[in-house]
Each structure stands twice: as C-alpha cells, then as structure tokens.
From Swiss-Prot:
Residues modified by glycosylation: N30
Name of the molecule in the record: Sphingosine 1-phosphate receptor 1
Modified residues (N6-acetyllysine): K10
Name of one Pfam family that matches: 7tm_1
Record field: transmembrane: 47-68, 83-104, 117-138, 161-182, 197-224, 258-278, 290-310
Cytoplasmic topological domain: 69-82, 139-160, 225-257, 311-382
Molecular function GO labels: G protein-coupled receptor binding; sphingosine-1-phosphate receptor activity
Binding-site residues, sphing-4-enine 1-phosphate: R120, E121, F265, I266, A267, C268, W269
Localization (cell): Cell membrane; Endosome; Membrane raft
Gene symbol of the encoding locus: S1PR1
Key words, A-Z: Acetylation, Angiogenesis, Cell membrane, Chemotaxis, Disulfide bond, Endosome, G-protein coupled receptor, Glycoprotein, Lipoprotein, Membrane, Palmitate, Phosphoprotein, Receptor, Transducer, Transmembrane, Transmembrane helix
UniProt key word Acetylation: yes
Length: 382
C-alpha cells in the first residue's frame, strides 16, 4: 500500500529544489526523445519559426486595433463589447505567449529551470484557455439574451463582468496546475512527449475540458438557431408573410454564420485535440507525429487571428470604427455616429423598434419579429 502511494505523492508534490534544477529539463527531453530531435535540428532559429512569429505579430496588431477601437468609441462601452474586448485581449496574449514560446525554444529550452519552463508553457495554456472560455462566454450571453429577448441593461453589465472574471480565474487555475504540483518531475514514465514535464493525466484532463467547451459552444449556437427558426415558424403560422419572409432570410444568414463560427473553431482546435489524445495514448518514442507539435499548435493560435474577423470586423459599425482607428482619424463621421449596432455573433445583430427603449415588458414574439438575430446592419423599424 505504501509503495503505491509514494509515486503519487511525488507526482503531486515535487520538491522545491526540483523547480530550479537545470538537469531535469535535459533528463525529461532525453527520455521522451525530444533532446535528440532538438540537437539534430538546432541550427539557430528555423525559417518556420520566423513565419510563425510573423503570424503572431499580425495577430497581436490585429487585436490591439480591436481593443483600441472599443476603447476609443464610446458607443462600444457596453456589455456585449466587453466580451469582444475580452476575447481580443486573450487572443493578443495568446500571440505574445506563443512568440515568447518560440523565442525560448530550441537550445534555449535547456537553459531554463523547470519553474521557467512551466511559466513558458503555462502562459500559453492560460491565454488559449481564456480565448476559448471567452468564446463560450459570448455564446452564453447571446443565448441568455435570445431567451429573454431583451437588450443589455445594468444587470447584464454585472453578468458580463462575472462571466469575464470567471474566464480568467478558471484559465489561470487550469494553466497553473502543473507548476502547483500536477507534473511528472518525479515520475518519468507518466510524462507527455509533447510537453515533457507535464503529466499525461493533466494533458488528458485539459483535452477533456476543451472538448466539453467545444460541445457546449456547438449546443448553444444550435439552440440560438433553433430559437430563431421557431419564431420564424410562428410568424408563418400567423400568415404574416412579409415579416416571416424577412425572418426566414435572417435565419438562413444566421445558419451560415453559425457554420462559419463553429467550422473555423473546430478546424483550428480539433487537430491539436487529436494530437494531445495521441500523446496520452502513445508509448514514449513510438509516435513520430508527436515531434511535429508546432504545426498543430500554430493552428490553435491562428484561431486568435480569425476571431477578430468573425466577431468584430463582420459588424459594419465596428468595421467603420476600426478603419478610422487605423487611418488615425480622430473625428468620427456624423453619419456613422448616428447609427448604433449591437453585435451578436459574427456579424449578427439585433434589430429593434423604438418601443424596446421603454421600460415596458417585451410583448409577444410575433409583435416584435425584428428582435431577432440577423446578419445585416441594425435598422430601426421606425
């Protein structure tokens, strides 16, 4: 009984001295076979790394402009835009973290202490986790809004900050678990090949969490589409042909947008999920694909580059503001300032009548068919 407990305790509670022992990095990389791979390829910074760094620089600049657009435009200081700003911040940090990861890779890896290595890899986990959790938070917010059929108010502001705070707290905990003890410093046979100081059980845990997040996002967006289709059928049943036709067009546009959102997300993240599952299942030095991690990871990072396009630039009002920021124009045009749009997902916005501004409760769905998600601009029905 005691003999089986000791390795478990060591795996969860590594001595403090292990975190500053330079030999541990070399030992673990040698055990997994990555030391030989690195030695064979180590001729300075690789061309592919330069390409990846340039991609990260684009992602960083792209998301900086999104944050500047939201900050400089007062009409965007609203709960839904907080989610978009939070997504841009996490994507920006993902670009920064991956750039730092690339610069500290290769021969530099063996000059790091385990504590520094955990910080290098953990920062990537935190940034990418925050990005995925932000996508989930946006989906939750849109679903709740669709259920209530109400636009944002004070209570929604509190809910927004609560969801955003939860994104970062959970991401920090998830990324910090290895440095807090869930690692394989003392148990080499349990080590991951992709991340040689990470325990395979931790890799499996993270993959499971991200897969559940993906499924949750898919379910929420499918539910949103279902709600829109239900309201469209109600209008058809009431023989309100013109409004039903408009609603059907919006439903089709919504379906296309949902396919884009989920398709891009799955295309970027699924390969990395599969690689990590292989890492958990494969024995050490048996799966050559595990030594090509950078190509799978850069796909996940690319999702941070597509998010601003899907969630921000597809909104016409934000696109105008974005262009103004890029052109260093300090005075927004009156024409664009007179309109106001509320992004939902990937260019989907609310359309509403003046009655939405009142304090009266929302009427039957059929009386306000414009209060649904669309793919166009917001046009007041008055």
């Amino acid at each position: 009984m005691g003999s089986t407990r000791i390795p478990l305790v060591k795996a969860l509670h590594s001595p403090v001295s292990d975190y500053v022992n330079y030999d541990i990095i070399v030992r673990h990389y040698n055990y997994t076979g990555k030391l030989k791979i690195s030695a064979d390829k180590d001729n300075g910074i690789k061309l592919i790394s330069v390409v990846f760094i340039l991609i990260c620089c684009f992602i960083i600049l792209e998301n900086i402009f999104v944050l500047l657009t939201i900050w400089k435009t007062k009409k965007f200081h609203r709960p839904m835009y907080y989610f978009i700003g939070n997504l841009a911040l996490s994507d920006l940090l993902a670009g920064v973290a991956y750039t730092a990861n690339l610069l500290l890779s290769g021969a530099t890896t063996y000059k790091l202490t385990p504590a520094q290595w955990f910080l290098r890899e953990g920062s990537m986990f935190v940034a990418l986790s925050a990005s995925v959790f932000s996508l989930l938070a946006i989906a939750i917010e849109r679903y709740i809004t669709m259920l209530k059929m109400k636009l944002h108010n004070g209570s929604n502001r509190f809910r927004s900050f609560l969801l955003i705070s939860a994104c970062w707290v959970i991401s920090l905990i998830l990324g910090g678990l290895p440095i807090m003890g869930w690692n394989c410093i003392s148990t080499l046979p349990s080590c991951s090949t992709v991340l040689p100081l990470y325990h395979k059980h931790y890799i499996l845990f993270c993959t499971t969490v991200f897969t559940l997040l993906l499924l949750s996002i898919v379910i929420l967006y499918c539910r949103i589409y279902s709600l829109v289709r239900t309201r469209s059928r109600r209008l058809t049943f009431r023989k309100n042909i013109s409004k039903a036709s408009r609603s059907s067009e919006k439903s089709l546009a919504l379906l296309k947008t949902v396919i884009i959102v989920l398709g891009v997300f799955i295309a970027c993240w699924a390969p990395l999920f599969i690689l990590l599952l292989l890492d958990v299942g494969c024995k050490v030095k048996t799966c050559d694909i595990l030594f090509r991690t950078e190509y799978f990871l850069v796909l996940a990072v690319l999702n941070s580059g597509t998010n601003p396009i899907i969630y921000t630039l597809s909104n016409k009002e934000m696109r105008r503001a974005f262009v103004r920021i890029m052109s260093c124009c300090k005075c927004p045009s009156r024409d664009s300032a007179s309109k106001f749009t509320r992004p939902i997902i990937a260019g989907m916005e609310f359309s509403r009548s003046k009655s939405d501004n009142s304090s009266h409760p929302q009427k039957d769905d059929g009386d306000n068919p414009e209060t649904i998600m669309s793919s166009g601009n917001v046009n007041s029905s008055s």
